[in-house]
């Protein structure tokens, strides 16, 4: 009797599963109370500042790293680095810095959207969700993994895009 292999749950799946308790919890907290609302805003601001500081520190580590003159073949398009036309490469330092800047841009745009939704229309759920998802987005930035956690061997460049739904990836196994 051979046991059927159960497919591994993709790493991003917990983010999708965490949404339901967050939405349920947001209905249980009285955000009409000024203290609760200000506490949520403070937590949101702290998450944004810590996420931005982590990305900025990673960017400093990228610029100070040795071996940045090595080349990455076929890095894909980005507004944050220039590819050499003759051999379709970019330096490792420029590539890693570009990936950190892309994540930083996503952070900034997300914060802008959340602030508009909250301060213009009064929604609080997006702030709660952002407090959960933003640190996981920073954690998933491969440049953060390589330069802050030393996971160089686990993430050979060019890095694959993380796009797609984790539920879809899990269902295809």
What role is predicted for each listed range?
Residues 104-127:
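Alpha-helical transmembrane segments and their membrane-interface junctions
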Residues 1-2, 17-30, 85-90:
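Membrane-proximal N-terminal segments immediately preceding the first transmembrane helix
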Residues 19-32, 51-60, 114-122:
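Membrane-embedded alpha-helices of multi-pass membrane proteins, especially ion channels
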Residues 10-20, 36-48, 102-106, 110:
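Transmembrane alpha-helices of multi-pass eukaryotic membrane proteins
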Residues 134-173:
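Cytosolic, positively charged, low-complexity intrinsically disordered regions immediately flanking transmembrane
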Residues 73-100:
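Short membrane-interface loop/juxtamembrane segments of multi-pass integral membrane proteins
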Residues 4-14, 24-42, 119-130:
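Membrane-lumen (extracellular) interface motif
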Residues 37-73:
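Hydrophobic alpha-helical membrane-embedded segments
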């Amino acid at each position: 009797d051979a046991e059927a292999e159960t497919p591994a749950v993709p790493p991003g799946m917990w983010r999708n599963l965490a949404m339901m308790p967050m939405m349920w919890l947001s209905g249980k907290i009285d955000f009409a109370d000024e203290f609760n609302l200000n506490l949520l805003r403070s937590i949101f601001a702290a998450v944004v500042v810590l996420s931005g500081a982590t990305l900025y520190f990673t960017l400093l580590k990228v610029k100070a790293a040795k071996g940045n003159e090595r080349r990455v073949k076929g890095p894909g398009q980005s507004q944050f680095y220039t590819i050499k036309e003759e051999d379709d490469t970019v330096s490792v330092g420029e590539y890693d810095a570009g990936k950190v800047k892309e994540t930083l841009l996503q952070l900034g745009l997300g914060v802008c959207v959340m602030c508009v939704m909250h301060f213009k229309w009064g929604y609080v759920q997006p702030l709660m969700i952002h407090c959960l998802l933003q640190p996981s987005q920073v954690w998933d930035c491969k440049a953060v993994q390589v330069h802050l956690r030393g996971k160089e061997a686990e993430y050979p460049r060019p890095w694959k895009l993380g796009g797609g739904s984790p539920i879809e990836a899990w269902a295809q196994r």
